[in-house]
Amino acid sequence: MHPTVSIAILNYQRRDVLRGALESARAQRFPVVEILAVDNGSTDDSVGMVRREFPDVRVVALDDNVGAAARNAGVAAAKGEIVVTLDNDVRLTTPDDVERAVAVFARHPRAAVVNFMILGPDGRLSRRDWCHPRDPDLWAEREFLTAYVLEGASACRRDAFLAAGGYWPPFFIGHEGLDLALRLLDRGHDLVYTPAVRVRHLVEPSARPSSRIYYTFTRNAFWVALRNHRPAAALGSLAQDLALMAYCAVRAGHARAFLRGVRDGLGGAPAALATRRPLSPATYRRLRALYGLRPSLFRRVLRHVRERLI
């Protein structure tokens, strides 16, 4: 017997883009129990559009923009045992995508999350969206266990997501998927990447990231380390993350954003430490195995430079 499935689409101020996401969700052959539009306090009539044009879609309307944490409200409101979570600019590419995601969960009974392959507007792998600890040139077409959650292009087991606490609201955006991944792994769950489900991300891959990315990713790297890692591991994780981010920020002309991120990452340390839950030794052993095929820091920097990822 198949599990029940909901589709939850996150939106903020992109009414016309949301329309396309809802249409791709409606086109699924798998009998989903519901489609939810989770709106982050939009003022562009997104909610009105959904209610007029998609009366079968359930609206979860938030008063304010709370960033990625709005997904928590969507998953909590969902009726399905599995919740497909998509951003408004992500499109399911075939009518069988949900059915394929369900099949991946059946193959991996310990999986809490199934991450999808993300394609760019040109239909090729979106290398900017590749967050897994594997070389995309070697692994993009293979299914494997990973150590990351792709927030806007994945499916989760609702109970596991909620039990792990969902996305920590102070992150707003940036590294919240890594933080949740660590907490799910620490609870004994698996995280899977599959090329069986391919979604298209409509963001133009050549678009230059704003300074906000360098700020939030730097700030949030501190909080991920403080919330999850033991001291030695925290220092190691931060050293690599900050080295890569500092280089990319300086190269892009956003050194000040990086420094603000360092300042506010340290300033937010008390709140992060208040929610601290250090990973167990068993989880560190799992992480060493999962990261065993990760390219070196030098290769990752080289890739970012060559492909201008951030």
Question: What is the meaning of each model-derived region?
Answer:
Residues 233-310:
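Non-catalytic, C-terminal membrane-associated alpha-helical segments of glycosyltransferases
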Residues 23-32:
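Short, acidic, metal-binding catalytic loop of nucleotide-sugar glycosyltransferases
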Residues 148-156, 160-165, 170-198:
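A short, conserved alpha-helix in the catalytic core of glycosyltransferases
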Residues 116, 130-147:
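Short, flexible, basic/aromatic active-site loop/helix in glycosyltransferases
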Residues 24, 39-47, 91:
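A conserved acidic beta->alpha catalytic loop
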Residues 94-126:
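Conserved donor NDP-sugar-binding/catalytic core segment of glycosyltransferases
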Residues 83:
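Short aromatic/hydrophobic "clamp" motif used to bind/position activated sugar donors
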Residues 61-78, 94:
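Glycine-rich, basic loop-to-helix element that forms the pyrophosphate-binding segment
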